Amino acid sequence: TMPLFDNENRILQIETEKEKIFKLMENPLISQPFTEDFAKRFSWSTNAIEGNTLSLEETIAVLDYDEVRSNHTYSEYADAKNAYYAIQKMLLPFAKAIIDEEWIKKANGYIRHMQGEYRDTTVYVGNLSEAVYYPPEPQDVPELMRNWIRGADIEAVTVQEIFEKIAANHVRFERIHPFSDGNGRTGRMIINQQLIN
């Protein structure tokens, strides 16, 4: 069977073209529309993964014109706006940043439009009748996160090595599940900051 993605060729393409891309991004006529497009698409996709039913077009309409349509909940529109705001505050302009406890809590706070604090309750992944994973107890989260943060600064030589280390780091973050909500969206913000770094 054919793989869904031809990762080897895509990684090779990124490896060979990254310097050219970095050079092009120095031109504001290229970087500004790219950055805006990234922010909107990431806002849409990070929420779609969580089950938000807004289309990309509907997400852009609410972000650009505050336009809402029927068949969607208020929270779906709020999630789109919150994610976009988080991206604007935390990831743009694309610049290196230290991913520490403050950064992570701030990102989660923007995503949820509230104070980003580690959870103080037991949570589960899945639904009430079929939990697929029980994250660590809340009292263990601060220490687990301190340990996780020590490995958040990804050092690698090749693009493939960067991707592999970030993916493994992301799995560890999601297994800790440090927040009562927004862990997936926060984790994807971290992935993007790690790629920027």
Task: Identify the meaning behind each predicted range.
Residues T1-N197:
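FIC/Doc superfamily catalytic core
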